[in-house]
Amino acid sequence: MLKLELKRIFSKKINVFAIGLALILAVIFSGFAVTSNRYVDENGNASTGIMATRKLTDNRRAWKGTLTEDELGTVIEQNKNAVTQSSEENAIYGTTLQPIDDIRGFIISVLTPDAEYDESVLNQITEENIQEFYDTYHKNMEKMAEEYGKTSVQKKYLEKKYNEIKLPVEYESYSSWDTMIMYVETYSIILAIIVGFICAGIFADDFQTKADAVFFSTKYGRTKAVKTKILAGVVTTVMIYCMGIILLSVICFGIMGTSGMNTPYQMYQAYSIYIMSYGQYYLLTVVCGFIASMLAASVSMLVAAKMHTISVAVCIPFFLYCLLPFIGRALSGYTTLFNLIPTILTNVQASVKVPLIYQIGNCVFRQIPLVMVMYTVMAIALLPFIYKSFRRYRNK
């Protein structure tokens, strides 16, 4: 029965068009991603072609490894010399400043925990400051834990998380991962909308074609057939999401490379409480996107099962992931509520920057894991209600 239901789904012309559109958009997004990084060569010529990211990685390869205080001191000295000699468009930028851009950003991030990005900090650092760099990092971690921890339990939790950061930091150029995280987030929203549209049709099509009487009169129409429809929705979600993400990832990483997979995210956001490498960060983003698609599928199927039409159901994913963020910004007085909406699943990039935590009893949870658990449970919990909605209709 499952095979037959899947055949119905994937043979429907509008669904084939939607899936084809998803795959075409994956290719288009790949094109944007692989040409989004900027590389300046030794002659000062800037390029953004498909090989720009690999060239950028090669340009920064000399700095791969452990960033000791001595290494950081060399970076500061090189930065000061370069700034006095050239601007970004000059040839010196490509050979002097560009290779250390990531490391410069890391130093600034560590030294300005509560301030905006300020390059002037690099010109104010002394040799003594550099030799005490990681000590300063530790002290600032303690201040951050004290500032964002509202209770003693929260403060201890934040201190524990910060202590998980391995110092000195290991560096490798992470441009491809940083770029991909941005594009995979946007693409996951598109996949969630497409999944919601296709899954809504699973329960609405029988009513639209007036075949519901035949469906309910069959031997398994009251039980197994409905369960099969629900299972088909889950399988369809997995298939579409995996096809799209795998295609996007294979194209982009195949062209840009996977350099920086083990580089800690703290290279970019020094005081993030999400202690992870860029590879783990990408996986987190992909998993959150999958949960978003599963939630979209469950809600769309439930609405379609109750209303017997696809028109309202297809709007649900668009509302959850496109409109709700704007509503949240408009209703700034309800920040606590909007920090737990489904949009977080498709906006991981913004959430990992903020040390937002919640406490229930003596248990402390970070925002993203809490949201992941909440909406995974919700997506699964809605499935029995879909089944019951169809049973209620049949008993009329």
Question: Language model features by range: what are they?
Answer:
Residues 14, 221-222, 309-314:
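Membrane-helix interface segments
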